[in-house]
A protein has these predicted regions:
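Short hydrophobic/aromatic-enriched beta-strand-loop microsegments
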Residues: 77-83, 119-127, 171-180
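Short, solvent-exposed amphipathic alpha-helical segments in soluble enzyme
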Residues: 114-119, 168-170, 192
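N-terminal glycine-rich anion-binding loop in soluble enzyme alpha/beta folds
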Residues: 1-36, 102-133
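Short, flexible loop segments at boundaries between secondary-structure elements
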Residues: 94, 131-132, 172-194
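Structural motif
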Residues: 38-43, 130-142
Length: 194
């Protein structure tokens, strides 16, 4: 990943969140979490993408659901969850309200742009996928259900099947897991006959 092999000081210097700028929450290799500046991460992802292409990678999947608008590959097939998920979720839920769980609050204008494919504006709640236990996730899922959500989307690659099961048990609603959707769509796109 972009932050691999960087010290905490280097991460803070190069990727530290800036006031009034979009942030992301990410998990480091040691299991700790850190908030980072989204635009700085996008620059780092672009650099990493070029390195991967130079190393011969022909397919690159971004393992983050954050919005990246400027990523460009020279020849690799670039798969970006933020471009797949809105259209896929919009097509799946149709005229139903989606409750979106995410690790950090997203500014309203950014959320509107990202989820414009949905027929009904979504409701949103914050729950870290990196917290111990499932209490935050289940509380957020209940809040979304109370707000009228007919289905839930866990909009971060950090959410796991355990989180999905906890939210589904708590609410009885269908729960879409971003990592699962991205993996299935990517697998379908890359299938080659034996």
């Amino acid at each position: 990943g972009v932050l691999d092999r960087l010290s905490d000081a280097d991460i803070a210097l190069q990727f530290g969140p800036r006031p009034r700028e979009q942030r992301m929450l990410t998990r480091l290799l040691d299991g700790s979490t850190v908030e980072v500046d989204a635009r700085a991460v996008e620059t780092g992802v672009q650099r990493k993408l070029l390195e991967l292409e130079d190393a011969g990678c022909t397919v690159v999947v971004v393992l983050c659901t954050g919005v990246f608008r400027g990523l460009r590959s020279r020849r690799a097939w670039l798969i970006e969850p933020d471009r797949i998920l809105p259209a896929l979720v919009g097509g799946l839920v149709g005229p139903r309200r989606v409750g979106i769980l995410s690790p950090l609050e997203m500014p309203i204008d950014a959320a509107r742009r990202k989820w414009a494919a949905l027929q009904i504006p979504p409701s949103a709640a914050v729950a870290s996928p990196y917290a111990a236990g499932d209490d935050g996730v289940t509380a957020a899922a209940r809040d979304l259900q109370r707000s009228g959500a007919n289905a839930l989307l866990m909009d971060c690659i950090g959410y796991t099947e355990r989180h999905r099961a906890a939210a589904a048990r708590t609410t009885g609603l269908p729960v879409l897991l971003a990592s699962d959707l991205v993996a299935r769509v990517t697998g379908a796109c890359l299938y080659k006959a034996p």
